[in-house]
């Protein structure tokens, strides 16, 4: 459960990310594909090489989903309901991949915003990314 402080920290981090969110999403995907190559199996039709147009486009979707969740942090489940349906019913992504991508996103944020990612902010962002992952896997059966 995200505390009031967690919510404030997450909103602060996303305000600092600003217009770079799409790039962060793509960089997180690139990092995930290299660090956890088994995740590429869900993207057989993608050019998963760093900087590819497809990775950038999907990174934009990832960033959009995370930004949507941050903007509706008091009701992440409702804000990501359609994405949850898509991932559970159509794409059938292994739920562990949300955790892996979340870890990669956290690393990207840390690389680009080291002063903003205090230990407290780090913990809050990690809790937020876990909450997003839980929402995205809630409709799995």
Swiss-Prot record:
Top-level taxonomic group: Eukaryota
Residues spanning the signal sequence: none
Molecular function terms from GO: haptoglobin binding; heme binding; iron ion binding; organic acid binding; oxygen binding; oxygen carrier activity; peroxidase activity
This protein's record includes keyword Iron-sulfur: no
Database matches in Gene3D superfamilies: Globins (1.10.490.10)
Pfam family membership, one: Globin
Entry GO terms, CC: blood microparticle; haptoglobin-hemoglobin complex; hemoglobin complex
UniProt cross-references to InterPro entries, sorted A to Z: Globin, Globin-like_sf, Globin/Proto, Hemoglobin_a-typ, Hemoglobin_oxygen_transport, Hemoglobin_pi
Binding site for O2: 58
Any coiled-coil regions, as ranges: none
Domain called Globin: residue spans: 1-141
UniProt keywords, alphabetically: Heme, Iron, Metal-binding, Oxygen transport, Transport
Annotated tissue distribution: Red blood cells.
Any single GO BP term: hydrogen peroxide catabolic process
Binding site for heme b: 87
PANTHER family: HEMOGLOBIN FAMILY MEMBER, HEMOGLOBIN SUBUNIT ALPHA
Quaternary structure and partners: Heterotetramer of two alpha chains and two beta chains.
Summary of the function given for this chain in its UniProt record: Involved in oxygen transport from the lung to the various peripheral tissues.
Similarity remark: Belongs to the globin family.
Name recorded for this polypeptide: Hemoglobin subunit alpha
Native species: Psittacula krameri (Rose-ringed parakeet)
Organism phylogeny: Eukaryota, Metazoa, Chordata, Craniata, Vertebrata
């Amino acid at each position: 459960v995200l505390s009031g402080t967690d919510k404030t920290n997450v909103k602060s981090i996303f305000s600092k990310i600003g217009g770079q969110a799409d790039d962060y999403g793509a960089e997180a995907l690139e990092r995930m594909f290299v660090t956890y190559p088994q995740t590429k199996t869900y993207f057989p039709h993608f050019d998963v090489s760093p900087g590819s147009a497809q990775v950038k486009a999907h990174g934009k979707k990832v960033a959009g989903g995370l930004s949507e969740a941050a903007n509706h942090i008091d009701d992440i489940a409702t804000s990501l309901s359609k994405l949850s349906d898509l991932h559970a019913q159509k794409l059938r992504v292994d739920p562990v991949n949300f955790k892996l991508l979340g870890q990669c996103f956290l690393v990207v944020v840390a690389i680009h915003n080291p002063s903003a990612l205090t230990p407290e902010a780090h913990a809050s962002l990690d809790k937020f990314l876990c909450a997003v992952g839980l929402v995205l896997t809630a409709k799995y059966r």
